[in-house]
Amino acid sequence: MIKGILFDLDDTLYNSSEFVEIARREAVKSMIDAGLNIDFEEAMNILNKIIKDKGSNYGKHFDDLVKAVLGKYDPKIITTGIITYHNVKVALLRPYPHTIKTLMELKAMGLKLGVITDGLTIKQWEKLIRLGIHPFFDDVITSEEFGLGKPHLEFFKYGLKRMGLKAEETVYVGDRVDKDIKPAKELGMITVRILKGKYKDMEDDEYSDYTINSLQELVDIVKNLKKD
């Protein structure tokens, strides 16, 4: 009997890949306008290397970009980039079209709903609140809280424990095979892969019990599972 669902957040409940890329590009443009003396594409290459080396949750991407270009710290240019990034993020941050309706229907079935996500706790909560979907979830589990992230099995076990669920009575929904679907499947959860975001073309031969193009498809899957 299915008792709960764990969701990934980024590119599962909203389009993370698109808004982040647009926000970063607009931030760099604003920094150049504020005095960062560099070609736009060259600046983006440097920024993307910083993000790759330091990780997406590193808090000083723009600081490092300015230091790499100017050889010094410039608070005006850095702050310009930060403000532009956040303004664009707020303007673009929207749930996928069927996210809210799907969460409402699942909640009406009496299921426990949780989010398990890599990232800084405050950042991930900010996204959930801005998306307007935080009231649907019984718990939100972040890698920052636990100290390890995906694909570590212990992180997923911790999430199940926090939710008071067993793996075999839990559906897991995510977009990435390597970080979401594979570890969830290895623990015995029923896995649903949503084909969204930059990893939608990632090969998956054995780990997804179901694949969906829209969250709306999840409702019928769960209804059928609850019959078993």
UniProtKB/Swiss-Prot annotation:
This protein's record includes keyword Metal-binding: yes
Entry keyword set: Hydrolase, Magnesium, Metal-binding
GO BP annotations, alphabetical order: small molecule biosynthetic process
Enzyme Commission code: 3.1.3.-
Molecular function as annotated in GO: metal ion binding; phosphatase activity
Cofactor dependency: Mg(2+)
Pfam families in the cross-refs: HAD_2
EC category name: hydrolase
Database matches in CDD domains: HAD_Neu5Ac-Pase_like (cd04305)
Organism domain of life: Archaea
Gene3D superfamilies registered for this protein in UniProt: 1.10.150.520, HAD superfamily/HAD-like (3.40.50.1000)
Cited function: Catalyzes the dephosphorylation of D,L-glyceraldehyde 3-phosphate in vitro.
Entry similarity comment: Belongs to the HAD-like hydrolase superfamily.
NCBIfam families per UniProt: CTE7, HAD-SF-IA-v1, HAD-SF-IA-v3
Protein name stated in the entry: Glyceraldehyde 3-phosphate phosphatase
Species this protein is from: Methanocaldococcus jannaschii (strain ATCC 43067 / DSM 2661 / JAL-1 / JCM 10045 / NBRC 100440)
